[in-house]
């Protein structure tokens, strides 16, 4: 091997450093960069958005999901380099589905006016069910919003939960007939645009809904060995089992090429069965590590995941647990230690 002299090495050093920076950036994006945190604002004791964005930056949280186009938050995100998933709230779907002009106005007011905010996805609706009045408006609203943002390179999707999916083991996953009639045209649209499907994945609810048959360690990523065998795939955690059940359902519905982004997952610290700081800490930290490596059905590729949620929300409606999903208290102090690396 020919040895280079000192001067040639020094001359090549800037190029080597540049290449190294690309390698490190790529690694960082596939590991830390896959994790975001949902910023719900249903509380009367939350701090100003500028302080919240600063907290994201201090904690190295590089992605945020925001459930409505709150102008204070969008302004605070300017120049932050935090990648944003911005929701179109369900009550707006009918209006945006009925008129391209309305969709254009929504995008102008909430996206184009914030050129120095990094928009990752627009989620058109959250957990809309086939029986909901808004169900028929999801796809046309997605189409109108997509036309309005297509020149900006922003992907458009919608977020679903797993109520419309059944089957065990994961390879038997399928959409229920009612849900399939709703989701099939959405799948076709997403496939044509190479956009991901957003899925809210909550092992907590599966566990508390069937504590007789589902083990807590399987739910918290702490099972010492395989719990579910499914052909060539083995499952040691419920999160992956749910995720792969959705993938199997997509494959049966013509959406085998789609990628799933987990748009919500977390664990409450109070208000119901199996809640508490210890379980929440275990779940969230293990989730962050687990999603780096893909699932048994889709191995080798990190799963982009958004933890629910940044703060407790004392104005949230529904069961008491709905108020206690936060990683942080309203005073910006952590409830428990989370390693976002």
From Swiss-Prot:
**Stored InterPro entries:** Glyco_hydro_17, Glyco_hydro_17_plant, Glycoside_hydrolase_SF
GO MF annotations in UniProt: cellulase activity; glucan endo-1,3-beta-D-glucosidase activity
Active site located where? 127 (proton donor), 264 (nucleophile)
UniProt EC number:
3.2.1.39
Q: Which residues are glycosylated?
A: 116
Annotated localization: Endoplasmic reticulum; Secreted
Q: Does the keyword Hydrolase apply?
A: yes
User: What induces or represses its expression, per the UniProt entry?
Assistant: By infection with a virulent strain of P.syringae pv. maculicola. Induced by infection with the biotrophic powdery mildew pathogens Golovinomyces cichoracearum and Blumeria graminis. Induced by infection with the turnip vein clearing virus (TVCV) and cucumber mosaic virus (CMV).
Q: Does the keyword Repeat apply?
A: no
Catalytic activity field: Hydrolysis of (1->3)-beta-D-glucosidic linkages in (1->3)-beta-D-glucans
Give the signal peptide range: 1-25
> What residue intervals traverse the membrane?
none
What Gene Ontology cellular component terms go with this record?
Answer: apoplast; endoplasmic reticulum; secretory vesicle
What family does the database annotate?
Answer: Belongs to the glycosyl hydrolase 17 family.
Q: What is this protein called?
A: Probable glucan endo-1,3-beta-glucosidase BG3
Q: Which organism is it from?
A: Arabidopsis thaliana (Mouse-ear cress)
Name of the gene this protein is made from: BG3
């Amino acid at each position: 091997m020919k040895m280079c002299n000192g001067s040639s090495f020094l001359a090549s050093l800037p190029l080597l450093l540049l290449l190294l920076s690309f390698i490190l950036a790529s690694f960082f994006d596939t590991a830390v960069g896959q994790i975001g945190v949902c910023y719900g604002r249903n509380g009367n004791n939350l701090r100003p958005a500028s302080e919240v964005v600063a907290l994201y930056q201090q904690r190295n949280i590089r992605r945020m999901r925001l459930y409505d186009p709150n102008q204070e938050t969008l302004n605070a995100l300017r120049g932050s380099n935090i990648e944003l998933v911005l929701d179109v709230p369900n009550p707006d779907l009918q209006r945006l589905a009925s008129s391209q002009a309305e969709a254009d106005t929504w995008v102008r007011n909430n996206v184009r006016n914030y050129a120095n905010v990094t928009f990752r996805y627009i989620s058109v609706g959250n957990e809309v069910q086939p029986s909901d009045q808004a169900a028929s408006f999801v796809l046309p609203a997605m189409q109108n919003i997509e036309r309005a943002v297509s020149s900006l390179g922003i992907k458009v999707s919608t977020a679903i939960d797993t109520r419309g999916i059944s089957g065990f083991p994961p390879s038997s996953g399928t959409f229920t007939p009612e849900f399939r009639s709703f989701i099939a045209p959405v799948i076709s649209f997403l496939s044509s645009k190479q956009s991901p499907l957003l899925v809210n994945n909550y092992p907590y609810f599966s566990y508390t809904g069937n504590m007789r048959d589902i083990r807590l360690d399987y739910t918290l990523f702490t099972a010492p060995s395989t719990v579910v065998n499914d052909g060539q795939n083995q499952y040691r955690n419920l999160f992956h089992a749910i995720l792969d059940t959705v993938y199997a359902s997509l494959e049966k519905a013509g959406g085998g090429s789609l990628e799933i982004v987990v748009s919500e997952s977390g664990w409450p610290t109070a208000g119901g069965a199996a809640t508490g700081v210890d379980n929440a800490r275990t779940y969230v930290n293990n989730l962050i590590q687990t999603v780096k490596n893909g699932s048994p059905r889709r191995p080798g590729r990190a799963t982009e995941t958004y933890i629910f949620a940044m703060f407790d929300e004392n104005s949230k409606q529904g069961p008491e647990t709905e108020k206690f999903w936060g990683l942080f208290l309203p005073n910006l102090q952590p409830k428990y230690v989370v390693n976002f690396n």
